[in-house]
């Protein structure tokens, strides 16, 4: 669909509509990120699509693991083997900018950018953490959880992006998240 992956039954309904007869709703997705796809057809397992389970986690169980060169290749002629690796495959409808750095600089910068965009008539979304939420002043502000909890951040990511799509958000500013357990996902 080109949209962020479904994390709730209603997302599946939006994406697939009348193409399926039934949806079994087991609640929200536990992780909220794409699944890791690993190719076991070669001697050394190869990650075809990074997801929650990163290379280091897999190597603890499998030994040596390669990463498909197409995943990180800057050359557009080197294609990844797995689905879901195209440039905008899981992108939200809105333009997304991630602001990295020290939080005492990131927060005022996001507030400034969001205010500029709102002044220009754009609907703005902000992705932050529980720790910084109260410091944001402009836009549809959504917390992704506690900064130290990789799993919570992973769980909420696609759901927040889809919420912004549903709300008609045109520009998203997000804090950067240091989430080593999420790997390249």
Cite the ranges covered by each PLM segment.
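Active-site-adjacent structural elements in enzyme catalytic cores
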Residues: 1-185
């Amino acid at each position: 669909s080109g949209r962020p992956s479904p994390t709730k039954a209603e997302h599946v309904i939006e994406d697939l509509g009348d193409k399926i007869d039934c949806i079994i709703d087991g609640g929200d997705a536990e992780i909220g990120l794409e699944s890791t796809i690993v190719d076991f057809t070669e001697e050394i397992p190869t990650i075809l699509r990074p997801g929650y389970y990163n290379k280091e986690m897999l190597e603890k169980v499998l030994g040596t693991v390669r990463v498909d060169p197409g995943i990180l290749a800057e050359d557009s002629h080197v294609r990844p083997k797995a689905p879901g690796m195209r440039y905008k495959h899981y992108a939200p409808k809105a333009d997304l900018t991630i602001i990295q750095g020290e939080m005492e600089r990131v927060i005022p910068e996001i507030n400034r950018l969001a205010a500029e965009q709102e002044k220009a008539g754009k609907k703005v979304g902000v992705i932050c953490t529980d720790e910084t939420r109260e410091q944001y002043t402009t836009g549809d502000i959504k917390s992704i959880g506690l900064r130290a909890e990789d799993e919570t951040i992973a769980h909420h990511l696609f759901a927040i992006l889809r919420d912004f799509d549903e709300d008609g958000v045109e520009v998203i500013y997000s804090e950067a998240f240091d989430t080593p357990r999420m790997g390249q996902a």
